Amino acid sequence: MKADVVIVGSGPAGIFTALELIKNGSKKKIIMVEKGSSIHKRNCPKSKTKKCVGCEPCNITAGFSGAGAFSDGKLSLSYEVGGDLPSLIGEDFAQSLIDYTDKIYLEFGADTHVEGINQGEKVKEIRKRAIQSGLKLVDCP
């Protein structure tokens, strides 16, 4: 089997790499290599054993979409949530990447509902309790 591009791993980074190559008009033959099982064969024994038994590869994180395959698809839409990316590339650019990613998810059918938008009083109360506990509540968006 011949390929121009080999993407190792079909987690979010691998999936988005392939998508960006295609969206940017690449005519190259792309192969994705994944060590994990298909989604239908990814069963974690922890639900029965109540502890990790060290499957190799891990049935939660390895496989198409990684652990995201089992998530409900919610994204944090603010650069203030997560790691150090804004300090490396700037807040505006980090936010533009988040917005770009959200747009892709929406193009593929993600739910457009944004939680908490119409619950101003409830959010104020949660923010007050967070501040009292020494926490910062981040609006997303």
Residue ranges and their predicted role:
Residues 1-13, 31-33:
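Beta1/beta-strand and adjacent pyrophosphate-binding region of the FAD-binding site
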Residues 18, 22:
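Gly/Ala-rich phosphate-binding loop of Rossmann-like dinucleotide-binding domains
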Residues 23-29:
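Conserved S-adenosyl-L-methionine
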Residues 35-42, 46-141:
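Conserved N-terminal/central alpha/beta ligand/cofactor-binding core
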Residues 12, 28, 43:
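Functionally constrained cores in energy, signaling, and assembly domains
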Residues 7-9, 17, 73:
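Conserved structural-core and active-site-/substrate-pathway-adjacent residues in large, well-folded domains
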